[in-house]
Design a protein with these regions (language model features):
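Extracellular glycoside hydrolase catalytic/binding regions
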Residues: 159, 168-326
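N-terminal carbohydrate-binding accessory modules
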Residues: 1-69
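Hydrophobic faces of well-ordered beta-strands that scaffold small-molecule active sites
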Residues: 3-9, 72-74, 108-112, 161-163, ...
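The substrate-binding groove and active-site-proximal loops of carbohydrate-active enzymes
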Residues: 44-52, 78-91, 129-141, 169-171, ...
Length: 376
């Protein structure tokens, strides 16, 4: 396969409230696990079925292929195989995704995005403020069996690029600075939460590789997230004799903005160049994919200082997004590939998100608005 040029189908099989909050309306839940706790099993199943049936369909795969992308990364929950009630499984939707991907010449990276007890305490890990999975050997083993079942079911599909073992297992530094830390709905449940230690993560990755490689054809890639520690891996995968693997790192300009008070293109360029060098250094040993990135930035959303026509303001916004996109694509094109987060937020492209800045997280809108051009 050529260099990975893809997009994520997040918020389809793994919910994230900020992306399309409508499904959570009236429940008081902040994440998918609590949605299941706030609703009856029947109501949860009905809500998820309605969402999964409508949020992504065949026309989206056609759209993605039309714009020259070659891969979709699909986050899936640990309960994909319908064995953790009350949460309905969703393997039948991933089955459809493979049919559509193969029809339009796309590859799929299956991304195991959550685990029982969470690996990061984010809403995208299933339950906000709780991060205890790595301390429960039974659930660690369960997660490995989910990976095995994914490999058995999809390993021989033509459209399978590979399987990502686990999304964003959190480091100590990221854990202590994450806004979600300390925001658990049930404080008792969150007791004992903490980061995922590097020795544990290395052993889990070795175990996951052994189980997956025993099932997957050798041409299928096994992908490992860097755990927010890109520079720590060095030659680990080489020393362990792992073949046809890749390292996934997630790079967001907007995250840098939380720590740097100046939001200007020259600051973004410095940051992007530093991340590019880090990716290139890690890639001396193992191919690196920038598995999540987007063009969201405060400079593009900053209102012009002088009053002007709406058309002129939109032009300035577009040019600022184009500049940021060009910077990032130039950098990430030196890696093994890049995967935009996310393909969409709201299902309807005519419906405005609740906050204007969210538009830049929606790749379909970025492409239609000419904010990003993969061919330049």
């Amino acid at each position: 396969m050529d260099k990975v040029k893809g997009t994520n189908l997040g918020n389809w099989l793994v919910l994230e409230k900020w992306m399309s909050p409508g499904i959570f309306e009236g429940t008081g839940a902040e994440d998918e696990i609590w949605l299941g706790r706030k609703l009856s099993a029947d109501k949860l199943a009905a809500k998820l079925k309605e969402h999964r049936d409508s949020y992504v369909n065949e026309e989206d795969f056609a759209f993605i292929a039309q714009y020259g992308l070659n891969l979709v990364r699909i986050p899936v929950p640990y309960f994909i195989f319908d064995d953790r009630p009350p949460y309905p499984g969703c393997a039948e939707y991933l089955d459809k995704a493979f049919d559509w991907a193969e029809k339009y010449g796309l590859q799929i990276l299956i991304d195991l995005h959550t685990c029982p007890g969470s690996q990061n305490g984010y809403d995208n890990g299933g339950i906000t403020g709780v991060c205890k999975w790595c301390k429960n050997p039974t659930e660690v083993e369960y997660e490995l069996t989910v990976l095995e079942r994914l490999a058995q079911r999809y390993g021989n599909r033509k459209g399978l690029y590979g399987i990502e073992v686990l999304n964003e297992p959190i480091s100590w530094l990221v854990y202590i600075t994450a806004p979600s830390t300390g925001k658990a709905e049930d404080k008792e449940e969150a007791k004992g939460s903490g980061h995922v230690p590097m020795p544990f993560l290395k052993q889990f990755y070795k175990d996951a590789y052994a189980r997956l490689r025993a099932i997957l054809p050798k041409e299928k890639v096994i992908v490992f997230h860097d755990g927010f520690r890109l520079g720590a891996w060095k030659d680990f995968f080489v020393r362990e004799g792992m073949e046809n693997v890749a390292l996934d790192t997630h790079i967001y300009v907007f995250a840098m903005e939380n720590f740097v008070p100046i939001h200007k293109p020259w600051v973004y360029q410095i940051y992007i160049n530093s991340q590019k060098k880090a990716v290139e250094k890690a890639a001396r040993y193992t191919p690196v994919i920038v598995g999540e990135w987007c063009i969201c930035n405060r400079y593009a959303e900053k209102p012009p200082q002088k009053v002007m026509l709406l058309e002129e303001a939109d032009r300035i916004r577009r040019e600022r997004y184009q500049e940021n996109a060009a910077m990032q694509l130039a950098a990430w094109n030196t890696s093994a590939g890049h995967i935009y987060w996310n393909y969409q937020l709201l299902r309807s492209r005519t419906e405005e998100p609740d906050e204007r800045w969210k538009e830049s997280w929606d790749l379909s809108r970025c492409l239609i608005n000419d904010w990003l051009d993969y061919n330049k």
